[in-house]
Amino acid sequence: MDSDVLTTLKILIVGESGVGKSSLLLRFTDDTFDPDIGATIGVDFKVKTITVEGNKAKLAIWDTAGQERFRTLTPSYYRGAQGVILVYDTSSRETFDKLEEWLTEVEMYSTKKDIIKMLVGNKIDKEGREVDRKQGLQFARRHAMLFIEASARTREGVQLAFEELVEKIIQTPGLWEKDGTSGGVTLTAAGSQAMSGCSGMYWKALSDLIRQFF
């Protein structure tokens, strides 16, 4: 049933805890918003198939924890990822100032040298903005990143963020083509073990879920 899918892509969402990574993911995949959603523990994972400029791609989207205590899981997150969304909260200058650290992490652990990076300024619906659009755009340009402002609450910019990221990845064949075939996403045994510290049952379930799709 997936014979018309051009490729399968691994996308990461990273950033400080509380910037709305999970909310962006749920808005994009399920079109839902929960104002009381809790912090991600370790990593969450969802699959969504989208069509961009006539090309159908299956996305395996990893929503990562922003807490320092989960950083030991980092190498497993980045392995094989073709795209990463770095998120900050436009109403929190601190989350914007932390972007340099997150970008350093991306560049350190990414196994794809041409990984496409998208910067998303989330929560533009909130009052008390501390980071204006120009600052976000300048940061993105300085680091050769795509850029958009969004609101998971109102939907604004969410779909477009993922579509533009996927479009750019597809325009970079070396990221997803291998020996003439589309790239795949796998959860290795080493990766499963590296992440098992959070919850063995959780990661077994996650591993089983991934195998259903890939």
Predicted regions and their residues:
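Short, conserved catalytic or interaction motifs in soluble domains
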Residues: 16, 30, 35, 89-92, ...
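Switch I (effector-binding) loop of TRAFAC-class P-loop GTPase G-domains
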Residues: 30-56
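Conserved alpha-helical scaffold flanking the Walker A/P-loop in AAA+ ATPase domains
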Residues: 46, 71-76
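Conserved beta-strand segments of the P-loop GTPase G domain that flank and frequently precede/overlap
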Residues: 61-62, 85-89, 119-122, 150
